UniProtKB/Swiss-Prot annotation:
Reaction proceeds by a ping-pong mechanism involving intermediate methylation of a conserved cysteine residue. Keywords: 4Fe-4S, Cytoplasm, Disulfide bond, Iron, Iron-sulfur, Metal-binding, Methyltransferase, rRNA processing, S-adenosyl-L-methionine, Transferase, tRNA processing. The gene is rlmN. Binds 1 [4Fe-4S] cluster. The cluster is coordinated with 3 cysteines and an exchangeable S-adenosyl-L-methionine. The active site is at 95 (proton acceptor), 346 (s-methylcysteine intermediate). It comes from the Bacteria. Residues 107-335 form the Radical SAM core domain. Its EC number is 2.1.1.192. [4Fe-4S] cluster binds at residues 121, 125, 128. It is an enzyme of class 2 (transferase). Belongs to the radical SAM superfamily. RlmN family. This is Probable dual-specificity RNA methyltransferase RlmN. It holds the Pfam family RlmN_N. NCBIfam families: rRNA_mod_RlmN (TIGR00048).
Length: 358
């Protein structure tokens, strides 16, 4: 049965080599099979033609290559954003989003993939569709990789590739740091898809222990903080994990992060009407982030069914933006919406699928 076989996509090149040797295959096949799995992204042992038929049969008998079932697919008519709803082996579902944009010269298409790290999310941010849908479990290494590989295979058919990865999909990446770290080592392997860790961004709600592990393991990724308020009392209300990792602790670990990495930190700030867009909120935000080399990304709230929050008017959004930029001299951007004509907010497509909506 499949569940008695080894999921071969979960293994690093070193682990794969050890497995193949234990199965009686030659040691150098470790690199060859790794290339088939992670660079060529094959989904069949039969395609591994530089292995003998006998060795391929051994792999079929003892291991398997997992793949996703695509439940739903949406593409934006406005900006060509693509959204995928995948079904996992145990019936769980996750979302992955492909963001397509022109480069600075407005010529070549750049492809950024927004990747999920968990089935649901335990953080339960009040503004997030994923948080409303509950939490099931962490994604395995292969489930993280398969999001990337499934989309990369589609792009290759059009002569394109993935350029950047952002772990801003479903789940809190730093609560799945072990599997995420292992997946990153495979992704950045020169014998694999070989996406540099410097082109990978991890977005976190502020899991201080996870940021500490990034520093300890010297994982050279870009970091984005889902801040959304620089006032503890307010942040507690919308991001419950702030009670465990308050702003003072977050600030301390980010100071150390920037000291060690010399990298700019992105702060994401969802604009919620009548909650976090006053001048007091703007000043608190500016005071908090001015100690860092930073960019603040303002995100107008994408309304979620069942959530109590609402989106501010364009006038209020612009007032907040201009005050930060011109008065407080914050390095701030206003996010250009992607996929606004499809289920754009994280978790919305999954939520609709659960309800049986089309």
């Amino acid at each position: 049965m499949k569940n008695e076989k080894i999921n071969i996509l979960n293994l690093t090149q070193e682990e794969l080599t050890e497995l193949l040797v234990s199965l009686g295959l030659k040691k150098f096949y470790g690199k060859e099979v790794f290339i088939w799995l992670h660079k060529k992204i094959t989904r069949s042992f039969d395609e591994m033609t530089n292995l003998s038929l006998k060795d391929r049969e051994i792999l079929k008998e003892k291991t398997y290559i997992p793949f996703f079932n695509l439940l739903k697919y949406q593409v934006s008519k406005i900006d060509k954003t693509e959204k995928f709803l995948f079904e996992l082996e145990d019936g769980g579902t996750i979302e992955t989003v492909l963001l397509r944009h022109k480069d600075s010269k407005n010529k070549e298409i750049r492809n950024t993939l927004c990747v999920s790290s968990q089935v649901g999310c335990p953080v339960k941010c009040s503004f997030c569709a994923t948080g409303q849908s509950g939490y099931m479990r962490n994604l395995s290494v292969s489930e993280i990789l398969n999001q990337i590989y499934t989309v990369e295979r589609r792009l290759r058919k059009k002569g394109e590739n993935l350029n950047n990865l952002v772990f801003m999909g479903m789940g809190e990446p730093l609560l799945n740091i072990d599997n995420l770290s292992k997946a990153l080592s495979i992704i950045s392997n020169e014998n694999g898809i070989n996406i540099s860790k410097r082109k990978i961004t991890i977005s976190t709600s502020g899991v201080v222990s996870g940021i500490e592990k990034i520093l300890l393991d010297k994982i050279p990724i870009e970091l984005a903080i889902s801040l959304h308020s620089a006032i503890n009392e307010k942040r507690d209300k919308i991001i419950p994990i702030n009670k465990n990792f308050p702003l003072e602790d977050l600030s301390a670990v980010l100071i150390e992060y920037q000291k060690q990495t010399k990298r700019r930190i992105t702060f994401e700030y969802i604009l919620i009407d009548n909650f976090n867009i006053s001048e007091t909120d703007a000043n608190a935000l500016a005071d908090f982030i001015h100690q860092f080399d930073h960019v603040v990304n303002l995100i107008p709230y994408n309304e979620v069914e069942g959530a109590e929050h609402t989106r501010p008017s364009v006038k209020k959004i612009n007032k907040f933006y201009i005050y930060l930029k011109n008065v407080r001299k914050v390095n701030v951007t206003l996010r250009q919406e992607k996929g606004s004509d499809i289920d754009g907010a994280c978790g919305q497509l999954r939520q609709r699928n659960k309800k049986g909506d089309n």
